[in-house]
């Protein structure tokens, strides 16, 4: 397990604590709810610190793009936790129709319901937008990864082509060297042939001269 994975494990532990505390918020009221909310907010701050640490670790990691996508998702999760805390603060302790304005006139009750409804709608819109942005980021990250893989493949192919070119240059040099050697051998053979012809002619001349001298005697 590397440093990123250990940090991620600590982050997940804090997220589990956040989820548990948020579920308990509607059961509290008054000062207890304020204390519970502060505890959740402290956990959220701690989770954000872990995310920041993971972002730094991801920059130099071999799987940088994959890990950066993870941290984006974790940021989105934290935003959802924050909205859930806001919603929980509006919910009643018994999760029914009671709320801080339950004994108030109808216009206050209606105002409370409208605010809660708007907050729920806004939360749903933010969740939907966050999901779309995350999917877009994932597609972008995948495209970037594919592009990097293609560049790596092209780089390897380029190295292979350069290696083949170098070998061709070496082969061409060897052919030129062999050609020079063969040309030298051919010249030596031609020279030797001329010398041999001259020697033969000289021998024939000497033999003819000896025969002539014998006839003259």
Curated annotation (Swiss-Prot):
GO BP annotations listed: hypotonic response; intracellular protein transport; vesicle fusion; vesicle-mediated transport
GO molecular function, one term: SNARE binding
Matches recorded under InterPro entries: SNARE, T_SNARE_dom, v-SNARE_N_sf, Vesicle_trsprt_v-SNARE_N
Residue ranges that the Swiss-Prot or TrEMBL entry lists as coiled coil: 36-97
Topology relative to the membrane: Single-pass type IV membrane protein
Bilayer-crossing regions: 193-213
Pfam families reported for this sequence: V-SNARE, V-SNARE_C
GO cellular component: clathrin-coated vesicle membrane; contractile vacuole; endoplasmic reticulum membrane; endosome; endosome membrane; ER to Golgi transport vesicle membrane; Golgi apparatus; late endosome membrane
Origin: domain of life: Eukaryota
Alphabetized UniProt keyword annotations: Coiled coil, Cytoplasmic vesicle, Endoplasmic reticulum, Endosome, Membrane, Protein transport, Signal-anchor, Transmembrane, Transmembrane helix, Transport
Residue ranges of the region described as Disordered: 90-109
Vesicular-side segments: 214-217
Ranges where the t-SNARE coiled-coil homology domain occurs: 123-185
Assembly: Component of the SNARE complex composed of syn7A, syn8A, vamp7A and vti1A.
Family to which this protein belongs: Belongs to the VTI1 family.
Function per UniProt: V-SNARE that mediates vesicle transport pathways through interactions with t-SNAREs on the target membrane. These interactions are proposed to mediate aspects of the specificity of vesicle trafficking and to promote fusion of the lipid bilayers.
Identification of the protein by name: Vesicle transport through interaction with t-SNAREs homolog 1A
Species whose genome carries this gene: Dictyostelium discoideum
Gene from which this protein is expressed: vti1A
